[in-house]
Amino acid sequence: MSILKNLAKNLGLTNITQPKKKYATVGEKKSDEEKERAKYKVKNIDNLKEDEVTKCPSCGVLSHKSEIRANMKMCSNCNHYFNMSARERIELLIDEGTFKEEDVTLTSANPINFPEYVEKIEKAQHDSGMNEGVISGLGEINGLKVSIACMDFNFMGGSMGSVVGEKITAALERAIEHKIPAVVVAISGGARMQEGLTSLMQMAKTSAAVKKMRLAGLPFISVPVNPTTGGVTASFAMLGDIIISEPKARIGFAGPRVIEQTIRQKLPENFQKSEFLQECGMVDVIAKREDLKATIFKVLNDII
C-alpha cells in the first residue's frame, strides 16, 4: 500500500486518488509542438530563433529565411513563390553593377490630410528601408539597356499613390528619352486610399505614359506578379505590349470572394490566376522565376 493510502487510512479519509504519472507511457499523445516538429521535419529548429524561420503557406514546411533568399525566394520543398522586395527584383533582373537608381528622394505628402497617414508612411519607410513603394532607374538585362521600375508589396501593400504613379510615369518617359525599352514589375493591392482622388489620378497618368511609349514605337514589358489587383491592374499593369507573369500569380481587380458575393455565382477554378488569364488571352507568357530574366531578354530581342 502506498504512503498516500496509509496516511488516508490513519486519518480516516476515503476516495483519495493518487496523482497521475507525469512520465510518458506507450501510446501517449505527443504535444502540439512535438506534432508540428514531426510533421514538418525541421532540422535543428531548437537552435533557430523565431524570426529566422518561415513557414511555407503552400506546403507547411518550415525553412530558414537565408535558405529561401538563396533560392530566389522560393520554397525548396514545393517551389512556392514568396514575395520579393523591389531590390531583390532588381538584383534578379538587372546585370550586376549596371543599375542606376533614379528619383530616389521622392516621398509622399498627405494631400487630403488623412488621419495617421504620415505615421504609416514613416513606419513603412522604417520597415522596408525604402522611401516609397517602387524603385526605378536605368540598367541592363544581359547587356540590353532598359528603363525599369519594380514595385514592393512590403511598402503599404504596394499601393499606388502620387509618388508611385510619378516614379512609374517617369520610368516610362525616361525610356522614351533614351529610346530604350521599359520593364515594370507590378505587385500591388491597388490605389492608395489615404490619398483619395490623387491616387486614382495615377491610373490615368501611368496609362497616358504607356500611350506615349506606344507612339514612340518603344516596347513596354509589363510583369504583374502575385498579387496584382485594383487600380494597378486597371491601368498600366495590363497595358504592356507583352505581359509576362510568374506561375500561379493572382491578377485581378476585386478579390474572388467579393465577386462571388456580388454575382452570387461560383467562380471557375484558378480564377484570376496567371494560367487562367493566359488561357483567356490576357497574359502572354508565364515564366518561372529562375527563367524570368532570360525570358524578358528573349522577348525584347525578338521585338526590337
From Swiss-Prot:
Pathway: Lipid metabolism; malonyl-CoA biosynthesis; malonyl-CoA from acetyl-CoA: step 1/1
Gene3D superfamilies linked to this entry: 2-enoyl-CoA Hydratase, Chain A, domain 1
Catalytic reaction(s) noted: N(6)-carboxybiotinyl-L-lysyl-[protein] + acetyl-CoA = N(6)-biotinyl-L-lysyl-[protein] + malonyl-CoA
This protein's GO CC annotations: acetyl-CoA carboxylase complex
Signal among keywords: no
GO molecular function: acetyl-CoA carboxylase activity; ATP binding; carboxyl- or carbamoyltransferase activity; zinc ion binding
Domain (CoA carboxyltransferase N-terminal): residue spans on this chain: 52-304
Chain coiled-coil ranges: none
Pfam families in the cross-refs: Carboxyl_trans (PF01039)
Binding positions for Zn(2+) per the UniProt entry: C56, C59, C75, C78
Needed co-factor(s): Zn(2+)
Root EC class: transferase
Membrane-crossing residue ranges in chain numbering: none
Cofactor: how bound: Binds 1 zinc ion per subunit.
Primary site of residence: cytoplasm
Residues in C4-type zinc fingers: 56-78
Keyword vocabulary terms for this entry: ATP-binding, Cytoplasm, Fatty acid biosynthesis, Fatty acid metabolism, Lipid biosynthesis, Lipid metabolism, Metal-binding, Nucleotide-binding, Transferase, Zinc, Zinc-finger
Superkingdom of origin: Bacteria
EC identifiers of the protein: 2.1.3.15
Protein's cellular compartments: Cytoplasm
Gene Ontology biological process terms, A to Z: fatty acid biosynthetic process; malonyl-CoA biosynthetic process
Family listed: Belongs to the AccD/PCCB family.
Complex formation: Acetyl-CoA carboxylase is a heterohexamer composed of biotin carboxyl carrier protein (AccB), biotin carboxylase (AccC) and two subunits each of ACCase subunit alpha (AccA) and ACCase subunit beta (AccD).
General function of this protein: Component of the acetyl coenzyme A carboxylase (ACC) complex. Biotin carboxylase (BC) catalyzes the carboxylation of biotin on its carrier protein (BCCP) and then the CO(2) group is transferred by the transcarboxylase to acetyl-CoA to form malonyl-CoA.
Protein name as catalogued: Acetyl-coenzyme A carboxylase carboxyl transferase subunit beta
Species this chain originates from: Fusobacterium nucleatum subsp. nucleatum (strain ATCC 25586 / DSM 15643 / BCRC 10681 / CIP 101130 / JCM 8532 / KCTC 2640 / LMG 13131 / VPI 4355)
Chain's gene name: accD
